[in-house]
Amino acid sequence: MSGQVRVAIVGAGGRMGRTLIEAAYNHDHILLGAAIERAGSSLVGVDAGELAGVGKLKVMIMDSLDYATDDFDVLIDFTAPDASIVHLDWCVRHKKAMVIGTTGFNHAQKEQINAFAEQTPVVMAPNMSVGVNLMWKLLELAAEVMGDYTDIEIIEGHHRHKKDAPSGTALKMGEVIAKTLGRDLEKCAVYGREGITGERDRETIGFATIRAGDLVGEHTAMFADIGERLEITHKASSRMTFANGAMRAAHWLVEQKPGLYDMQQVLGLH
C-alpha cells in the first residue's frame, strides 16, 4: 500500500507501547490515530507523542477503543493474553485488522484467535524482528543437516519484567526445529533440568531460560555433537526492532483478506 495506514496502539503507556508510538511517528507510511491505556490510568489525557518523547502529536491517550472507532485501520497489541483476546473480539465487531505481538497464549486462546481471524485480517508473531524471522529459516536448514545426530538446546534471556517463560520466540524456535525433524514439540521438549535426570535423550529439545536486568531479548539454538557444535544466535539491543516490524506488518496487513498471518508472510519468506 502506498498511502498512510492509521494505527491504534493499546498498552500505550508501557515500555513497548511507548516504543511503538515512537516507531509510528518515525514511519513514513504510518499515522498514529489512537493510543489506549487501561481505565483509571494516570496517563489518560496525556499527549501520546510527549509520552514517547517525540513531541506533541495531538493524539491524546484514551481509556477505551470505543472512543477511537473512526480513527484507525489497524490495532497493534503487545499487552497480555487475556487483554489481547478482548481487543481482537472488539476488532472483529468493528471490522478492524490487528497485529498481535503478545506472547503466552494458552491452547484455548490460540483457538479463539484462529476463529476470530476467519472474520478479520490478523498478523500474530512471537517476534517481529527481521533478524529473528530469518533465523527461523536458518534453523530449518540446520535441523535438516544436523538435527538427527546432535543434541539440540535452546537458551533464551529477557529482562526481569517478562512474565512468560520460555519466551514465545524460543518456543517458535523449538516448533520450527521439531517440525523439520518430524517430531512433536509437546512430547520432546524438556523445560529445565534439576536433580538426577539420567543421560540425555537425543530425541529431546532442551529449553533454558534466563531472566535478568534489562536484557531486551537473546536467543540461541545449539546443535551439539562430539567435537563440534553449531550455535545460531540472535540478540536484540532495542525494542525498536520489534516495533519497526509491527509497523511493517500493519502496513502490509491493511490490504489482506481475513485470515491469520505471520511475519514470514509479511517479509515474503514463505
Swiss-Prot record:
UniProt pathway: Amino-acid biosynthesis; L-lysine biosynthesis via DAP pathway; (S)-tetrahydrodipicolinate from L-aspartate: step 4/4
InterPro entries registered for this protein in UniProt: DapB_C, DapB_N, DapB_N_CS, DHDPR_bac, NAD(P)-bd_dom_sf
Entry superkingdom: Bacteria
Any GO BP: lysine biosynthetic process via diaminopimelate
Record flagged with keyword Cytoplasm: yes
EC number: 1.17.1.8
Chain residues that bind NAD(+): 11-16, 37, 101-103, 125-128
TM stretches of this protein: none
Reactions catalysed according to its record: (S)-2,3,4,5-tetrahydrodipicolinate + NAD(+) + H2O = (2S,4S)-4-hydroxy-2,3,4,5-tetrahydrodipicolinate + NADH + H(+); (S)-2,3,4,5-tetrahydrodipicolinate + NADP(+) + H2O = (2S,4S)-4-hydroxy-2,3,4,5-tetrahydrodipicolinate + NADPH + H(+)
Active site: 158, 162
One Pfam family named in its UniProt record: DapB_N
Residues noted as binding NADP(+) in the record, renumbered to the chain: 38
Keyword line: Amino-acid biosynthesis, Cytoplasm, Diaminopimelate biosynthesis, Lysine biosynthesis, NAD, NADP, Oxidoreductase
Compartment annotation: Cytoplasm
Name of the top EC class for this enzyme: oxidoreductase
CDD domains tied to this protein: DHDPR_N
Binding site for (S)-2,3,4,5-tetrahydrodipicolinate: 159, 168-169
PANTHER family per the UniProt record, alphabetical: 4-HYDROXY-TETRAHYDRODIPICOLINATE REDUCTASE 1, CHLOROPLASTIC-RELATED (PTHR20836:SF0), DIHYDRODIPICOLINATE REDUCTASE (PTHR20836)
Biological role stated in the UniProt entry: Catalyzes the conversion of 4-hydroxy-tetrahydrodipicolinate (HTPA) to tetrahydrodipicolinate.
Protein name: 4-hydroxy-tetrahydrodipicolinate reductase
Annotated organism of origin: Shewanella baltica (strain OS155 / ATCC BAA-1091)
